[in-house]
């Protein structure tokens, strides 16, 4: 029904109750069953500056729900009094998964989607992201030796959206040279790229447009379906003409990727559904 569809559209793209999250739990419990004893786990809740604010130890099935109660209070912030049309932030070259996170095009898409995941609750359905990135062509091939090949494949052979790449997952996951680099050269496992693309598609699904500003190699960004402009001002004016109208509500997040992130929520909704 259309009502059910509307509810689905309002839901955040990921949650602590998703199939992926429950599968993580099932995998751990299956390992415990085969080992014949449970894991002893220590779970620390960190604040915005990565300081420990709570520490729980014990059997994961019992301990983790208690840990998440505190983590949810720190993470989900009921704040917004209105929905926003445009989200502004910057993307450094080195963060999260390592140097090149903000310049490798597939890793860039994962980072853009992470912002959608965090702040979808306070953004309009046709929202626009404007993000600065040096986008200089640095793939960091030593860390992600498979991503240049994935990116090139995405440019050809009817690859219109990132999920079209899914059929190559096993092909990359069994590539012996990539596996050797994972085992001996500190590279990521080749299937990690498919995890990144799975997340990376969330940004396209939940935005009207994404602009990268200040790119040295803008063609790399355009190859991922992103729009490119020289400055924030140019991107905002273009977004106003094409997507948001003349008076957009703008959410500027200057500390993005510098501090431990929160998930912004509507003030009146509190932490419902997190």
Please place each PLM-identified region on the residue numbering.
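Membrane-embedded hairpin module used as a gating/binding unit in multi-pass transport
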Residues: 10-98
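Short glycine/threonine-rich loop-to-helix capping motif typified by GTGT followed
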Residues: 53-58, 97-107, 139-152, 225, ...
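A short, acidic, amphipathic alpha-helical segment used as a generic capping/interface helix at domain edges
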Residues: 61-78, 111-119, 185-204, 230-242
């Amino acid at each position: 029904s259309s009502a059910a569809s509307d509810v689905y559209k309002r839901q955040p793209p990921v949650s602590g109750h998703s199939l992926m999250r429950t599968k993580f739990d099932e995998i751990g419990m299956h390992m415990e069953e085969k080992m014949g004893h449970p894991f002893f786990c220590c779970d620390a809740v960190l604040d915005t500056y990565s300081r420990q604010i709570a520490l729980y130890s014990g059997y994961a099935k019992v301990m983790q729900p208690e840990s998440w109660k505190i983590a949810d209070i720190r993470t989900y912030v009921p704040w917004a009094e209105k929905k926003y049309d445009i989200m502004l932030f910057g993307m450094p070259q080195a963060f999260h998964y390592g140097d090149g996170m903000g310049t490798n095009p597939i890793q860039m898409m994962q980072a853009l989607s992470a912002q959608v995941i965090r702040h979808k609750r306070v953004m309009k359905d046709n929202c626009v992201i404007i993000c600065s990135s040096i986008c200089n062509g640095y793939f960091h091939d030593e860390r992600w030796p498979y991503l240049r090949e994935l990116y090139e494949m995405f440019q050809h052979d009817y690859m219109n959206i990132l999920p079209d790449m899914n059929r190559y997952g096993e092909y990359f996951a069994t590539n012996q040279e990539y596996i050797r680099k994972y085992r001996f050269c500190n590279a990521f496992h080749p299937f990690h790229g498919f995890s990144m693309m799975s997340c990376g598609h969330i940004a396209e699904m939940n935005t009207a447009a994404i602009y990268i500003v200040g790119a040295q190699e803008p063609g790399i960004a355009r190859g991922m379906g992103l729009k490119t402009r020289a400055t924030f001002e140019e991107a905002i004016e273009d977004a106003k003409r094409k997507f948001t109208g003349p008076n957009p509500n703008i959410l500027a997040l200057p500390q993005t990727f510098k501090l431990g992130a929160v998930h912004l929520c509507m003030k009146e909704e509190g932490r419902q559904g997190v």
